[in-house]
Amino acid sequence: MPRSLKKGPFVDGHLMKKVDMAVANSDRRVIKTWTRRSTILPEMVGLTFAVHNGKKFMPVFVTENMVGHKLGEFAPTRTYHGHAADKKSKAKK
């Protein structure tokens, strides 16, 4: 169920302060954040965030298509190593 329109999108206060400072100073440095739950707003377009995935910080450059999504959607937390290969079928070939 989506968030109520009267509440508006959720963005952590400390992240919004960093975004406002970066926009005001036209600063293009990477903004390091642990807040994966914050919604991407139109003011964030063009900024680069370093979003923590539980192990390291993943760089996320925000584009117009990302507005309305969460920051955590673009920093995967799980690595896929593929399914285990069947050793018997490889040995016959």
From Swiss-Prot:
InterPro entries: Ribosomal_uS19, Ribosomal_uS19_bac-type, Ribosomal_uS19_CS, Ribosomal_uS19_SF. Keywords: Ribonucleoprotein, Ribosomal protein, RNA-binding, rRNA-binding. GO terms for cellular component: cytoplasm; small ribosomal subunit. It holds the Pfam family Ribosomal_S19. One of its GO terms (molecular function) is rRNA binding. It comes from the Bacteria. The keyword Ribosomal protein applies. Gene3D superfamilies: 30s Ribosomal Protein S19, Chain A. PROSITE patterns: RIBOSOMAL_S19. The keyword DNA repair does not apply. GO terms for biological process: ribosomal small subunit assembly; translation. Belongs to the universal ribosomal protein uS19 family. HAMAP family: Ribosomal_uS19. Protein S19 forms a complex with S13 that binds strongly to the 16S ribosomal RNA. This is Small ribosomal subunit protein uS19.
